[in-house]
Amino acid sequence: MGTSSDIFELDPIYQGKGLRIGIVMSRFNKDICEGLLSACETELDRLGVAREDVLLVDVPGALEHPLALQKMAQSARYDALIAIGAVVRGDTYHFEIVSNESSRGILDVQLETGVPIANAILTVDTEEQAHVRMAEKGRDAARVAVEMANLLKRL
């Protein structure tokens, strides 16, 4: 990335070799989550993350992500974590609670532990929107995890 000044800038590194990645995936909206996971795994492979360096943990839903992610982050076994899930709007206020609180919890875990977490919990109005977004969001989560793990090693 070029800048117009003489300030040194760290370019992103997308090399996953040797990185240990933890993934927490919801069982709720399972077909969407499996689509996200498939795209994420494919991208992790492409970035050089070895399958034996990836651990997948299933949780019931999006509100359970922060606790599982916190425990994984505190273990010091992972360079980065990925949250995979899908919250589809229904007819009640529950959507807002789950969406907001899971996101807040994930951010809190990152800041508390210093372990980067790529948030690939889709929050959508319809299942169709989720299916349209899941492949790119899954790939993006893998890239974010690898980029942030490498960045934090350099800071």
Swiss-Prot record:
GO terms for cellular component: cytosol; riboflavin synthase complex. The keyword NADP does not apply. The active site is at H94. It comes from the Bacteria. The keyword Transferase applies. It catalyses: (2S)-2-hydroxy-3-oxobutyl phosphate + 5-amino-6-(D-ribitylamino)uracil = 6,7-dimethyl-8-(1-D-ribityl)lumazine + phosphate + 2 H2O + H(+). Belongs to the DMRL synthase family. Keywords: Riboflavin biosynthesis, Transferase. Its EC number is 2.5.1.78. One of its GO terms (molecular function) is 6,7-dimethyl-8-ribityllumazine synthase activity. (2S)-2-hydroxy-3-oxobutyl phosphate binds at D91, T92, R133. This is 6,7-dimethyl-8-ribityllumazine synthase. 5-amino-6-(D-ribitylamino)uracil binds at F28, A62, L63, E64, A86, V87, V88, N119.
